[in-house]
Structures are given as C-alpha cells and as structure tokens.
Regions:
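Single transmembrane alpha-helix segments in multi-pass membrane proteins
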Residues: 37-41, 56-116, 129, 133-148, ...
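Transmembrane helix-bundle core of multi-pass membrane transporters
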Residues: 55, 150, 154, 158-226, ...
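Loop-to-transmembrane alpha-helix initiation sites
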Residues: 150-152, 178, 205-212, 254, ...
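Membrane-interfacial amphipathic/re-entrant helices at transmembrane-helix boundaries
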Residues: 2-81
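Helix-loop-helix "hairpin" substructures at the membrane interface of multi-pass membrane proteins
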Residues: 201-280, 305-306
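Cytosolic-side transmembrane-helix boundaries in multi-pass membrane proteins
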Residues: 1-26, 34, 39, 238, ...
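Short loop segments and helix-boundary regions at transmembrane helix junctions
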Residues: 10-20, 90-97, 116-121, 125-187, ...
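Transmembrane alpha-helical segments in multi-pass inner-membrane proteins
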Residues: 259, 264-265, 269-340
Length: 373
C-alpha cells in the first residue's frame, strides 16, 4: 500500500508527462519568438506577439473569423495525415523521414488522375494513397531484405519523386504560369465533397478532408492499441528478433508498416490538392515542407494519434498567425522562427519524459535507503 501512495501523478499518468514536455517545447518557442520581436522593435512587440497567437481572432467580424478558421483547418488536415505517417512508423521502430516524398507521390498521382485523366475524386484519392503506399513499400522492402537504413532510402526517394512528379505534372501545367491547372477549371468532379462545410465556414476549400483526418486519427489509435495486427507491428518494432522467434513475420510487418505510413502521407497530399486549395508548382526545386513538419507534429503530439490533431493545428495556427503582423515593422517569418525552435525542441520531448521518470525513480530509491538505515 505504501508503494502505491508513493507513486507520483506523473508516473501514473504518462499522458501528463507527454503534455508537460510538449508544453515546455511550445513555451520555449514562443519565448524565443517574443525575444526576437523585442530585438527588432520593442515598441510593438506585445501587439505583434498577440497577433501571432490570436491568428483569425485578429478579425473583428465573426464571419471573417470563421472563414480564416476554415483556412487554418484546411491546411491542418494534410499535416495531421503526415504526422500520422511518421508516428505510425515510429511506433513500429522505423523513422519515416520519407513522409515528404510519399506526400509528393500522392500529390502527383491525384493531380494527374484529376487533370489528365479527368477521374472522379474518389479514384484520385485512392490513387494518392496507393502512390504513397508504393513508395513506402519500396523503403520497407529495402530495410527488410537488404537491411538498408530507412532514413537513407527515404531521403533518396524523396528527391527522386520530386523531380519525377515535376516532369509528369508538367503535362497539365497552366501555360500562363508555373502551376498546374485548378481543379475547378478543368475537373470540378475531382474536388472532395464539401457536405455543407464550405457554407458553414464561408470557405470554398473546406471539404470532408478535415473530418476524415480526425477519423483517421481514431482509426490508427484503435488499430495500434486494440488489434492483434497492431500488437504484432509494435512487437516487431520493439525487438525484431524476439518477434521472429515468437512466429511473427518480421519482414512482412516492416514492409506493411512502411506501406501504411506511405499511404497516410499520400492521403494527406490528396486532402490538400483535392480541396483545390493549392496547385503544384512544376518548377519547385525542394520537397514540400508538409512532410517534414509532420515529424514535428508527431513528436509534439507525444507520438499519439489523438495528440497529433492538436499539435498539427497548433503548428498551422502559429504559421497562419504570422500573416497578421504589421509588415512595416516585422517580417511574417517570425512565426517560422517560433515553429523552428519548437520543432528543434521536439527532439527533446522523449528526453524530458525519460528525465521525469529518472528523477522520480531516484527519489524513491533515496527514500527507501533512508528507511533502511
């Protein structure tokens, strides 16, 4: 009984450890951003900082607030999917830095199906998922059969997919610019259904992508926590040799994991581009940041599918908030600085949790030693 009483709140509630560690990362990022604002222009630092935090609340009219909230939610949905891709693989002991390339593959597949083949949205969505999954399977197979580090193979595939997609989508580029055609102008049937969300938020790009992203978070949580296959995948990640000894198909599990992770990232690309919110620039020379930001969102959310919803929204909220700064005094890149610090600190989330457990463990040993004396 005495041992139970000595258990700390932090040790009994692991989610609280994750929450506290994530909050520390967020607060440090906000602090650095505020200091940068003070250095640039102390007089307007407080107002500028509040503008970043408030984001759409900076508008006085409710309809403007709702519309800009819709924009934030639209760009949150693909980030949620990319963070799910990263955390799903991480739960199985793999670091899916290839979420960026899988996102690119999904973007290329859905846009080509929509603009070149004039297919309906459901087919374009499935094409994006399959393209991302295929890229993930390639990395998983290289890891399973040739023991090629997934980080190396994923990074190489990221760049291969970028230039491949640029080449393919050049066939559906608008001649007046560097971007692909809008779906509304060429194939409105490829746009995801809005089911009234566009009217509710006053934002035409508000589609089923947002609720679907939330549903996928719940599905992944249930799959990893409550199903036999999810248990096998996690067991393979914890100890591949032990899993094989227990009769689990370790190679198949690794390939399946990367395939599912790739499919999630590909779905994220479909959520972005099939909402017709953004077009693909066929001349871009760098991989879109969405996939890499998914890494930050995954760790900031404590590698929990439900936490990924809130961390992804926070990242996009701060990113959009930078657009409300007074451009004569500050650069909107201040919000990027805040996010950069938060992303950097995300690497310490697991370290902070381990530190909390170590400290509590040391404290109990000291008290036990005192009683023995």
């Amino acid at each position: 009984m005495q041992t139970d009483k000595e258990k700390s709140l932090l040790r009994r509630l692991p989610w609280l450890q994750t929450l506290l560690a994530s909050l520390v990362c967020i607060l440090l990022g906000l602090l650095v951003g505020y200091i940068a604002l003070l250095i640039i222009n102390p007089a307007g630092a407080n107002e500028a900082f509040l503008s970043i935090i408030k984001n759409f609340w900076s508008y006085s009219k409710p309809e403007k607030q709702l519309k800009n909230l819709g924009v934030t939610l639209v760009i949150t949905a693909p980030l949620v999917m990319c963070s799910l891709s990263v955390l799903f693989a991480y739960k199985v002991g793999l670091f899916n830095i290839g979420a960026a390339g899988q996102y690119v593959a999904g973007a290329g597949a859905c846009l080509y199906c929509a603009l070149a083949l004039k297919l309906p949205w459901i087919v374009c969505l499935l094409a994006a998922i399959l393209a991302g999954a295929l890229l993930g399977v390639i990395s998983g197979a290289m890891k399973a059969y040739r023991n090629v580090n997934e980080v190396i193979s994923c990074i190489m595939l990221n760049w291969i997919m970028l230039y491949l997609v640029n080449t393919v989508l050049a066939t559906v580029k608008n001649p007046t610019g560097k971007d692909t055609y809008t779906l509304a102008s060429r194939n409105p049937g490829a746009i995801l259904p809005t089911v009234g969300l566009n009217d509710l938020f006053g934002q035409k790009n508000m589609t089923i992508a947002v609720p679907l992203a939330v549903v996928m978070c719940v599905v992944i949580w249930v799959f990893l926590s409550k199903t036999r296959l999810g248990y096998e995948l996690r067991a393979t990640g914890l100890n591949r040799n032990a899993a094989r000894y227990c009769g689990m198909r370790d190679r198949f599990n690794m390939i399946l994991t990367m395939g599912i992770a790739g499919g999630l990232a590909g779905m994220g690309a479909a959520f972005m581009f099939l909402s017709d919110f953004e077009q693909w620039a066929v001349t871009q020379a760098s991989v879109p940041a969405m996939g890499f930001n998914g890494i930050a969102a995954a760790f900031l959310g404590g590698l929990n599918p439900i936490g990924a919803i809130f961390s992804s929204y926070f990242i996009q909220h701060i990113s959009r908030g930078g657009g409300h700064l007074n451009m004569n005094m500050y650069s909107p890149q201040i919000s990027d600085l805040i996010l950069a610090v938060i992303i950097y600190m995300c690497g310490f989330v697991l370290f902070m949790k381990k530190f909390m457990n170590t400290q509590r463990g040391t404290g109990r040993k000291s008290r036990k030693g005192g009683r023995d004396q």
